[in-house]
C-alpha cells in the first residue's frame, strides 16, 4: 500500500482487500446487531464483550498488515558493481553459521539481494525476509509486517470460530423461531463465517508451522532448505518469540514529506532578478566569467566580489608577468621556432637577452644550429661588436685554449679548462689555420665554421636550444667570430683548401673550380699569397734549410707507422676523426695558443719566436718525450701507397722555400676521400726519426707522407 503512491492506479488489486474488509466488518456488524443481544440475556453479558475485543484485534492487525511497510529496500541509483567492466554475476555466496547461502543479483533494483530477501513481482520491490504477497491485505508480507499478519490470522481464526460458535448457540436457544428475522440473520452470518473458516484456519495452521520452524512461505514453497539445514532457525520457542516479541525492524524508506510553502513578507523579501536583466556565463569550472548589467550597479556588486574572490580559471597561455622562469623558456622557444621555421629569421640578440648566464656577452649568443642555408646570418652580421670586444669576454662557444698561461696573449679572453680525453672533438680546421698561417680573416672564418667546443656548456647550449643536427655541423653560425668576419669582404680561399664541414654540394663546386689550379707546373702570376712570412726571423729560415738537407740525405721508409706528430701537423684527416680513439698527449696541443684576433688584412704575427703558421711539427719531427693523439686512420694507411679505399692524391707543387723577401709559401696535398690537407712540415726533425721521402726527379724533391700524402719541393 505505501509503495503504491505515485504509480498508476489499478482498481483490480483493491477488489480482494475490499471484499475481505466488507465480509469482516459486515458479518461482525450483523452478529453484534442480531445475535449478541440475545446471547447477553440467555448466556452471559461477557459474550458481546469478548467478540468486540476480538473483532477490534482482528481489525487492528488487518490494518497494520495492510498499511505497514513490509521492509522494502530502496533501489540503487547506480549499479553496485559499476567499477567492474564486466557484467555482474547472477549469484554471490555468503556464509551464515557455516552454511553457504547464495545472494542473487536483482536486475530491477540493481543490487545483490540479502539473504531471505526476494523481489515481489506485484509490488516490484525487494522485500527483506519476503514471505509472500497477500492479495487480501493488498501488501507484501515481509519482516516488518509479518508479525501483524500472523496475529491477524490467529485473531481472525479465533474471531470466526467465536462468531460461528456463538451464532450456533443462539440458534439452539431459539429453535422454535427459525422463521424469525434474528434467527435467519444469525444463520446467514454463520454460513459466511463457516465459509471463511476453512481457508483462514488452514492458512493460520500453515504459518504456525513456519514460525515454529523458522521459515518463510517463500523458503518453504521454493524448497530452499528442504534437503538441508536452515541456518536461520533458532529453535521453536526462539522462533516464536522472535516473531511475536522482537523489536520491529527499521524502516529503509523515508516517509514522504510535503513541501512546505512559507510566505515571506517585504522585510525579508529578496529582489527578484530575471534572466533578461543579468546574463551570466558559466565557465567549465563553475566560475562566473562574464556579467552583463542591465539594472543598477549596486545589484551586481556582491556577485562580482564573489567571482573575484574565487580562483580564476586556468588561462590558455601562462601568465608571463607572474612566472618569470616560464616566460624565459617560452620566449626562447618561441623565438627559436620563428627563426628556424620562418624564411626571414629575427635578430638573434633579441632571443638571447633572457638566456641564463652561460656567457656574459651577447656576441656569443647566436643560434647553435641551422635548418637552411639562410639561417639568420644577415641579422647577426649587423651587430656592431668587434673582435676585440668578443675576445675579452669568455664564451661557452669559443674554442678552449690549449696554450699555457705563459704563452697566452693578454688580448685573449679566458678559456675553458682543456680536457685531453675529450680533445677528439676539436675541429680540424682550427689546426689547419694554426698550421698554415692564413690571414686572420680566413683563420676566424675557419674557426667559426668548424669549431665544436668540448666544454659541457657548449654541449648544453646545443641540446638546450635544439638538437645537435648534421646541419649545425655543416654550417654553424654560433661563433661570434663568424659575425665579425662576415662583416667584411670574404677573401678567396687558399689553393687546395676545402672546409671539412661544408655541404657536399658546395664541396663539389669548389673542387671543380680548384682542379685546374692544381697542376704541378710553375706557379702562375697571382696576387700575393694569403700565407705570408714577411716577419719570419732568420733562424726559422735556417731551420727550413736544415730540413731540406735532411730530406735529401734520409732514405724513404716504406712501412712506417703513423707519425705521432702528424696529429699536430696542420689539418686532421677526416671530419670523423673525432670519433676515433684518441690518447691523452702532452704535445703541442697543450702549447698552442688560440687564434690571434688582429684586425683584418694584417698577417698573424706570433708573439714568440715561432709563428703560428710554423708552430706545428712535420712528419718526421715530433718533440722528444711527447705523444700526439691518433688520427682517424688506422696503421694500415701508413704505407707509401694510398689504400684502395682512398682515391689518388693530388700533388701540389710547393713554392720555393726561400724568396728574396724570405717568404715561404707552402702548398699541401689533399685527399679526395675527405677534402682535407694531411700535414705540413715546418719544424726540424728529431734525432733518430728519419722523415718520409721519395727520390728526387729533375730538381723537384718528392716527399711521401702517411696515408698516401705526397709533397713536391722545388730545390
UniProtKB/Swiss-Prot annotation:
Residue numbers carrying Phosphothreonine: 294, 303, 348, 350, 411, 436, 659
PROSITE patterns cross-referenced by the UniProt entry: DHHC
Topological domain spans for side Cytoplasmic: 1-13, 74-148, 213-715
Pfam family, one: DHHC
Induction record: In neural stem cells, rapid up-regulation by EGF, combined with FGF2 and heparin.
GO CC annotations on file: dendrite; GABA-ergic synapse; glutamatergic synapse; nucleoplasm; phagocytic vesicle; plasma membrane; postsynapse; postsynaptic specialization, intracellular component
Domain DHHC: start-end pairs: 104-154
Protein topology in the membrane: Multi-pass membrane protein
Positions of transmembrane segments: 14-34, 53-73, 149-169, 192-212
Segments forming a coiled coil: none
UniProt modified residues of type Omega-N-methylarginine: 617, 697
Bias (Polar residues): 442-478, 666-677
Positions of region (Disordered): 289-715
EC number: 2.3.1.225
Low complexity bias spans: 359-373, 422-432, 581-597
Residue ranges annotated as Extracellular topological domain: 35-52, 170-191
Modification Phosphoserine, positions: 247, 296, 299, 345, 380, 398, 406, 409, 415, 425, 429, 432, 529, 554, 621, 684, 694
Distribution of this protein across tissues and organs: Highly enriched in brain, detectable in liver and heart, and undetectable in most other tissues.
Additional facts recorded: In neural stem cells, rapidly degraded through the proteasome pathway following growth factors withdrawal, a strategy used to induce differentiation.
Domain notes: The DHHC domain is required for palmitoyltransferase activity.
Protein name (record): Palmitoyltransferase ZDHHC5
Originating organism: Mus musculus (Mouse)
Amino acid at each position: 500500500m505505501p509503495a503504491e503512491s505515485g504509480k498508476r492506479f489499478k482498481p483490480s488489486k483493491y477488489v480482494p482487500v475490499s471484499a475481505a474488509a466488507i465480509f469482516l466488518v459486515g458479518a461482525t456488524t450483523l452478529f453484534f446487531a442480531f445475535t449478541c443481544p440475545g446471547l447477553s440475556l440467555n448466556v452471559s453479558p461477557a459474550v458481546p464483550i469478548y467478540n468486540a475485543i476480538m473483532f477490534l484485534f482482528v481489525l487492528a492487525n488487518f490494518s497494520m498488515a495492510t498499511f505497514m511497510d513490509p521492509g522494502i529496500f530502496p533501489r540503487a541509483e547506480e549499479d553496485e558493481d559499476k567499477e567492474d567492466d564486466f557484467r555482474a554475476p547472477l549469484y554471490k555466496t555468503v556464509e551464515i553459521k557455516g552454511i553457504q547461502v547464495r545472494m542473487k543479483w536483482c536486475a530491477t533494483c540493481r543490487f545483490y539481494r540479502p539473504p531471505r530477501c526476494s523481489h515481489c513481482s506485484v509490488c516490484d520491490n525487494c522485500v527483506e525476509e519476503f514471505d509472500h504477497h497477500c492479495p487480501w491485505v493488498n501488501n507484501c508480507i515481509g519482516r516488518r509486517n509479518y508479525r501483524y499478519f500472523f496475529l491477524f490470522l490467529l485473531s481472525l481464526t479465533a474471531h470466526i470460530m467465536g462468531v460461528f460458535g456463538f451464532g450456533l448457540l443462539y440458534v439452539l436457544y431459539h429453535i422454535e423461531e427459525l422463521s424469525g428475522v434474528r434467527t435467519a440473520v444469525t444463520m446467514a452470518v454463520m454460513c459466511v463465517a463457516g465459509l471463511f473458516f476453512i481457508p483462514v484456519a488452514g492458512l493460520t495452521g500453515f504459518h504456525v508451522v513456519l514460525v515454529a520452524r523458522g521459515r518463510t512461505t517463500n523458503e518453504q514453497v521454493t524448497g530452499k532448505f528442504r534437503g538441508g539445514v536452515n541456518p536461520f532457525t533458532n529453535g521453536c520457542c526462539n522462533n516464536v518469540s522472535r516473531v511475536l516479541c522482537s523489536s520491529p525492524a527499521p524502516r529503509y524508506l523515508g516517509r514522504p514529506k510535503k513541501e512546505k510553502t512559507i510566505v515571506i513578507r517585504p522585510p525579508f523579501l529578496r529582489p527578484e532578478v530575471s534572466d533578461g536583466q543579468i546574463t551570466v556565463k558559466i565557465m567549465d569550472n563553475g566560475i562566473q566569467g562574464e556579467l552583463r548589467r542591465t539594472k543598477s550597479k549596486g545589484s551586481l556588486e556582491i556577485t562580482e566580489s564573489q567571482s573575484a574572490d574565487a580562483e580564476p580559471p586556468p588561462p590558455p597561455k601562462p601568465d608571463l608577468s607572474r612566472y618569470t622562469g616560464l616566460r624565459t623558456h617560452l620566449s626562447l622557444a618561441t623565438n627559436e621556432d620563428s627563426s628556424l621555421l620562418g624564411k626571414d629569421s629575427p635578430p638573434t640578440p633579441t632571443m638571447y637577452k633572457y638566456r641564463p648566464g652561460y656567457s656574459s656577452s651577447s656576441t656569443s649568443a647566436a643560434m647553435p644550429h641551422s635548418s637552411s642555408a639562410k639561417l639568420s646570418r644577415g641579422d647577426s652580421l649587423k651587430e656592431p661588436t668587434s673582435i676585440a670586444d668578443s675576445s675579452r669576454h669568455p664564451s661557452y662557444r669559443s674554442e678552449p685554449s690549449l696554450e699555457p698561461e705563459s704563452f697566452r696573449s693578454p688580448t685573449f679572453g679566458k678559456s675553458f679548462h682543456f680536457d685531453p680525453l675529450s680533445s677528439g672533438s676539436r675541429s680540424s680546421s682550427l689546426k689547419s689555420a694554426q698550421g698554415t698561417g692564413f690571414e686572420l680573416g680566413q683563420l676566424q672564418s675557419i674557426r667559426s665554421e668548424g669549431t665544436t667546443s668540448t666544454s659541457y656548456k657548449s654541449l648544453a647550449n646545443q641540446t638546450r636550444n635544439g638538437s645537435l643536427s648534421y646541419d649545425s655541423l655543416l654550417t654553424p653560425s654560433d661563433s661570434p667570430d663568424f659575425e665579425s668576419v662576415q662583416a667584411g669582404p670574404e677573401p678567396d680561399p687558399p689553393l687546395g683548401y676545402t672546409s671539412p664541414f661544408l655541404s657536399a654540394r658546395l664541396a663539389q663546386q669548389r673542387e671543380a673550380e680548384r682542379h685546374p689550379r692544381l697542376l704541378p707546373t710553375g706557379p702562375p702570376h697571382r696576387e700575393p699569397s694569403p700565407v705570408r712570412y714577411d716577419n719570419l726571423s732568420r733562424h726559422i729560415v735556417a731551420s727550413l734549410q736544415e730540413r731540406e738537407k735532411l730530406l735529401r740525405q734520409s732514405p724513404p721508409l716504406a712501412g712506417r707507422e703513423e707519425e705521432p706528430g702528424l696529429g699536430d701537423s696542420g689539418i686532421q684527416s677526416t671530419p670523423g676523426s673525432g670519433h676515433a680513439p684518441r690518447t691523452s698527449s702532452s704535445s703541442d696541443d697543450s702549447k698552442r695558443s688560440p687564434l690571434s684576433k688582429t684586425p683584418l688584412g694584417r698577417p698573424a704575427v706570433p708573439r714568440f719566436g715561432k709563428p703560428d703558421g710554423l708552430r706545428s711539427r712535420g712528419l718526421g719531427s715530433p718533440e722528444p718525450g711527447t705523444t700526439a693523439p691518433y688520427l682517424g686512420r688506422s696503421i694500415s694507411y701508413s704505407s707509401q701507397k694510398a689504400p684502395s679505399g682512398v682515391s689518388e692524391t693530388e700533388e701540389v707543387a710547393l713554392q720555393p722555400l726561400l724568396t728574396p723577401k724570405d717568404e715561404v709559401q707552402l702548398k699541401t696535398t689533399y685527399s679526395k676521400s675527405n677534402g682535407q690537407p694531411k700535414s705540413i712540415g715546418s719544424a726540424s726533425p728529431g734525432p733518430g726519426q728519419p722523415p718520409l721521402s721519395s727520390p728526387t726527379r729533375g730538381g723537384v724533391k718528392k716527399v711521401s707522407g702517411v696515408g698516401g700524402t705526397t709533397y713536391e719541393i722545388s730545390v
